[in-house]
């Protein structure tokens, strides 16, 4: 999980979604997992 100020899709499989007001990126490539914070 990377914590970043700016979350972006890294590849076409990445999905951006919001959970409890926190923007997150989920992907089948575990390296691409991100959270805004």
UniProtKB/Swiss-Prot annotation:
InterPro entries: Ribosomal_bL36 (IPR000473), Ribosomal_bL36_sp (IPR035977)
Any Gene Ontology CC annotation: ribosome
The keyword Ribosomal protein appears for this protein: yes
Keyword Magnesium: no
Ranges that cross the membrane: none
GO MF annotations in UniProt: structural constituent of ribosome
SUPFAM superfamilies listed in its UniProt record: Ribosomal protein L36
Coiled-coil segments on the chain, per record: none
First and last residue of the signal peptide: none
Record-level GO BP terms: translation
Any Pfam family matching the protein: Ribosomal_L36
Record keywords, A-Z: Ribonucleoprotein, Ribosomal protein
Protein family (similarity comment): Belongs to the bacterial ribosomal protein bL36 family.
Entry-linked HAMAP family: Ribosomal_bL36
Protein's name in the database: Large ribosomal subunit protein bL36
């Amino acid at each position: 999980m990377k914590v970043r100020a700016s979350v972006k899709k890294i590849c076409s499989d990445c999905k951006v979604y919001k959970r409890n007001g926190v923007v997150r990126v989920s992907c089948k490539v575990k390296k691409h997992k991100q959270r805004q914070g």
